[in-house]
Amino acid sequence: MMLEDFKIQWFPGHMTKAKRMMESQIKLVDVVVEMLDARIPRSSTNPMLQDILGSKPKVIALNKIDMADKAQTDVWLEKIKHSGLPVCKIDCATGKGVKQLISAVQLAAKPVIDKWLKKGVRNRPVRVMIVGIPNVGKSTLINRLVGKNKVMAADKPGVTRGQQWVTIAKGLELLDTPGVLWPKFDDPSVGFALAVTGAIKEDVFDREQAVELLLDLLIRKYPQDLLNKYAVSLEQGDDVNAVMAKIAVARGCLKSGGQLDIDKVVQLVLRDFRAGRLGRFTIDEP
């Protein structure tokens, strides 16, 4: 399968509502934190956000760094810095980099705070809106900052509840927003990246096609990690179908009679990739 053939169009009604809520709340916000997936920094950048956010100070939080290729992450960091935006690499699951993110937000808010002080306004919390695609880790970040599970999160795209302000002890008031996608992915590589990382519900794309493309990418860029995980050998001339067959045999993904159960292989590879069990991979090239 060619990447150009991978098509997705997904814009649930609740995302339209979330976008409208975000537009109405932006007037109350002092700083915006846009969370990106470090494995797909380009694909997880929502092109609609700039129109919504306007000139608000923005900090980029590159999340899930422990699942991404370290060398590629460093290149992405420099690229984002070169664009003029402050950026922090974080891992919300472990708390890595979260303190640095708080410092970056406070620094971005300093011009706003200085204006308040000139007007005699004191002790007002800095209001921060956290934005990003589904499953990028917004609620996990707030849970980490608050220190308790005040924001319910689920490992499914588009299920975080309505917007809510959460006050934390660092003089920040955070707004968690439901993940918002855009209605059409003009670049099929973006749809593919969002699909395999779990930002899009699986019922709107062909999982087997997605895994074929993913395996093709891993064979080209990270063959040793892939082979080590599934204990298979890669012979010259092996294509994606051959590799899927080898994984099926190695992992017992077989139907009665010894037929390959490709659907089980697809589920296995997707699950392992999303959990970071295959290794540290970056899909988007800087």
Regions found by a protein language model. Give the residues of each.
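Short, solvent-exposed amphipathic alpha-helical segments in soluble enzyme
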Residues: 49-51, 77, 146
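Conserved active-site beta-strand-loop modules that form the wall/rim of enzyme catalytic pockets
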Residues: 92, 142, 172-175
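Helix-rich effector regions associated with P-loop NTPase G domains
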Residues: 1-31, 39-48, 52-58, 65, ...
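Glycine-rich phosphate-binding P-loop
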Residues: 127-147, 151, 177
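Canonical P-loop GTPase G-domain recognition
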Residues: 59, 66-131, 150, 251-254
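Redox-cofactor binding/interface segments in oxidoreductases and associated redox assembly factors
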Residues: 34
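Alpha-helical scaffold segments in soluble metabolic enzymes
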Residues: 100, 104, 140, 213, ...
